[in-house]
């Protein structure tokens, strides 16, 4: 089985059926609700960063440098990571996909600002995006599993293109900087995932939300799994 572990904010660690360890949008060392720091992360094969903001990207650089993991993300973001000492990157752009040892990864549209933390000259500004993964099945698995990490985003009509193609959706509900609970529920209508795990909420007061109220709002549209930092979901 694959396992998703929530580390707070938009950071998830994904252990795949085939033995790869991935981490989405690391934000650990300065995250007030994270259960671990970057020094606590062990084996890591890939770091996936949806955009360059301080709460999604700089810890990814730390982890890639220490573990030797490959960073995956938008072209300009990965080019900046290389200037910071990251040796292995895979540059992509929105709408493009690539087959990795863990499966197929595609960058999906997101509507969010794209400045890069640490890029004081502003030379590496890029598009924010999400990730859609079609994971390779492991031994004894009935089939691959499809994971959608939306990144920070507003509600997008393009999400309808994912309908019926997502097993587990990781969606922000915090409002203020991203879509809130109402728009996230509409996103679920668009995507029709089997399971939804809310993210990007309760890190700071401006994005405080009651996840149980979100569960009630979503109702029968999908199974909502609320994870506290450090908790995991297997699928």
Protein language model regions, located:
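Beta-strand-turn-beta hairpins that frame and shape the catalytic cleft
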Residues: 1-3, 15-22, 97-106, 135-147, ...
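Active-site environment of divalent metal-dependent phosphoester hydrolases
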Residues: 30-31, 53-58, 78-81, 96-99, ...
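Binuclear metal-ion centers of metallo-dependent hydrolases, dominated by the metallo-beta-lactamase
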Residues: 70, 82-97, 185, 189-235
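Active-site neighborhood of phospho(di)ester-bond hydrolases with catalytic His/Asp-centered motifs
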Residues: 23-26, 44-52, 72-75, 147-151, ...
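Pre-active-site segment of Zn-dependent metallo-hydrolases
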Residues: 13-53, 58-65, 113-125, 153-164
């Amino acid at each position: 089985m694959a396992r998703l572990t929530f580390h707070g904010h938009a950071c998830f660690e994904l252990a795949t059926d085939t033995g790869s360890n991935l981490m989405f949008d690391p934000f650990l060392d300065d995250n007030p609700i994270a259960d671990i720091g970057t020094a606590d992360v062990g084996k890591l094969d890939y770091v996936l960063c949806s955009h360059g903001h301080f709460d999604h990207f700089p810890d990814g650089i730390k982890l890639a440098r220490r573990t030797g993991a490959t960073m995956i993300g938008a072209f300009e973001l990965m080019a900046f990571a290389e200037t910071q000492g990251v040796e292995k990157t895979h540059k992509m752009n929105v709408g493009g996909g690539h087959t990795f040892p863990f499966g197929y990864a595609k960058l999906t549209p997101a509507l969010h600002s794209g400045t890069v933390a640490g890029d004081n000259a502003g030379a590496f500004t890029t598009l924010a995006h999400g990730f859609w993964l079609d994971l390779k099945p492991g031994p004894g698995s009935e089939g691959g599993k499809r994971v959608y990490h939306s990144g920070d985003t507003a509600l997008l009509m393009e999400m309808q293109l994912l309908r019926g193609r997502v097993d587990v959706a990781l969606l922000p509900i915090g409002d203020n900087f991203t879509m809130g609970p109402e728009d996230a529920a509409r996103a679920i209508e668009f995507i029709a995932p089997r399971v939804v795990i809310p993210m990007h909420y309760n890190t700071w007061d401006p994005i405080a939300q009651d996840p149980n109220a979100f569960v009630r709002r979503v109702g029968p549209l999908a199974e909502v799994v609320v994870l506290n930092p450090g908790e995991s979901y297997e699928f």
